[in-house]
Amino acid sequence: MKDITFVDLEVTLNTCRVVDIGAVRSDRTPFHENSFDNLLLFLHQVPYISGHNILKHDLSYLKPQFEKAGCRQPKIIDTLYLSSLLFPEKLHHQLSKDDKLQADKSNNPVNDSLKSLLLFEEEQNAFERLDSMLKMIYYGLLHDTDRVRRLF
């Protein structure tokens, strides 16, 4: 799992403005600032970024920042799609929010990034346990789809 950084952005519902940014490298080094410039420095030369629902949520805010800075965008791994693929028996695939005990308490993007990292580790273990034929079937069907391409 080397060289993956897990990212989470907190965005206001009414203005769609990023209000908090968190990230965790695969070696567990955290980042917690509301600065895209500093996030890009933290992500410098990282080949992969990951997150839970990163393709449909966080990437829409991150992509313009990479373009604006003239930076290469890392490849994307979305733990949400891997979760539904590797844990089909689960009723839902959202990250647990057990650290959010009060209804009005805002999400912590560093905690969510760490949860994505831990989920990805579970997903890797689940994939390794799959029958080799099922791995080949998954590869044949999914190796060129944006949602799970990076697994292969």
Give the label of every model feature segment.
Residues 1-152:
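DEDD superfamily 3′-5′ metal-dependent exonuclease/proofreading module
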